């Protein structure tokens, strides 16, 4: 049985057609499809982590690859250019069709002061660098591990030279983030969102009688914990496609993406009843406010 290491669904046995399938899937960087593979990318959090590790490792020798841990629990190998305490890492987004940060360069340089510092090109919101909690923990974990391995007692400064320019193509300014990109990542991997991915996930989901259609990783984790009888799948905004599944379904997600599906926040309950599906809306990360809409069966 071949299990995806990120979303923990099983792949159809008939799709496993070559010897490399298991190795590729277990790397986290490949999603097996009916006729081949889709490539996952790495998040800005993983890219920043790789830059920090490479900068430290390069104090010993020139470095071209490093292995970093991810929030999903899968170690990933990343190509780098690093020498004498300075590293450059190019983010790649796999087969994602519209990731504007694809190809952006992260730089990391060692410094005497212990700790992790974020420089130019990393956005700021309310006086704080725009680094998500999960990404910050990932970078810190890899920094500590590399520091111990190479007996390093200093710090690392991470910057994104083109961050401010690339950020203009994102929605950062609308949410109050200025001066650069955000450093994010709840799994460490970028899902290769495209039509083929949605079709592939739906085919995989057909193996299960009950599925939880989730809007993202946090909703996936919530569904996995609260509804263990349902196999969770991340479908993002592609909820209508997922509803084609003929078995029992629930939708679990945060209001931001659910209102896109419904047309507005006020219509979430109405859409649930129209589709005859239960919708669980998570209002915040602390699970202190959840509202549950029971759709009427057709």
UniProtKB/Swiss-Prot annotation:
Catalytic activity: Co-precorrin-5B + S-adenosyl-L-methionine = Co-precorrin-6A + S-adenosyl-L-homocysteine
Pathway named in the protein's UniProt entry: Cofactor biosynthesis; adenosylcobalamin biosynthesis; cob(II)yrinate a,c-diamide from sirohydrochlorin (anaerobic route): step 6/10
Keywords, ordered alphabetically: Cobalamin biosynthesis, Methyltransferase, S-adenosyl-L-methionine, Transferase
Enzyme class: transferase
Keyword Glycosyltransferase tagged: no
Entry annotated with the keyword Methyltransferase: yes
Protein family (similarity comment): Belongs to the CbiD family.
Descriptive protein name: Cobalt-precorrin-5B C(1)-methyltransferase
Organism: Archaeoglobus fulgidus (strain ATCC 49558 / DSM 4304 / JCM 9628 / NBRC 100126 / VC-16)
């Amino acid at each position: 049985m071949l299990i995806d290491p990120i979303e923990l669904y099983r792949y159809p046995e008939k799709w496993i057609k070559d010897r490399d399938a298991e190795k590729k899937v277990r790397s986290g960087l490949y999603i097996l499809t009916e006729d081949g593979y889709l490539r996952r990318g790495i998040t800005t959090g993983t890219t920043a982590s790789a830059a920090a590790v490479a900068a430290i490792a390069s104090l010993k020798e020139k470095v071209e690859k490093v292995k970093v841990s991810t929030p999903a629990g899968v170690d990933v190998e990343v190509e780098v250019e690093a020498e004498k305490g300075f590293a450059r890492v190019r983010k790649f987004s796999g087969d994602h069709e519209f990731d504007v940060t694809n190809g952006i360069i992260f730089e990391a340089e060692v410094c005497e002061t212990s700790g992790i510092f974020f420089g130019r090109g990393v956005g700021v919101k309310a006086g704080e660098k725009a680094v998500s909690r999960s990404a910050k923990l990932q970078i810190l974990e890899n920094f500590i591990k590399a520091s111990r391995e190479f007996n390093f007692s200093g710090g690392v400064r991470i910057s994104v030279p083109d961050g401010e320019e690339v950020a203009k193509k994102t929605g950062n300014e609308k949410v109050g983030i200025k001066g650069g990109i955000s450093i994010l990542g709840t799994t460490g991997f970028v899902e290769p969102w495209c039509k083929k991915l949605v079709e592939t996930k739906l085919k995989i989901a057909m193996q299960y009688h009950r599925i939880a259609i989730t809007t993202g990783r946090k909703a996936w984790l919530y569904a996995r914990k609260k509804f263990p009888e349902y196999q969770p799948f991340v479908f993002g905004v592609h909820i209508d496609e997922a509803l084609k599944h003929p078995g029992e379904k629930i939708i679990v997600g945060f209001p931001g993406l659910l209102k896109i599906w419904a047309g507005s926040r006020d219509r979430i309950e109405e859409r649930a009843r129209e589709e005859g599906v239960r919708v669980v809306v998570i209002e915040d990360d602390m699970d202190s406010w959840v509202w549950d809409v029971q759709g009427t069966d057709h």
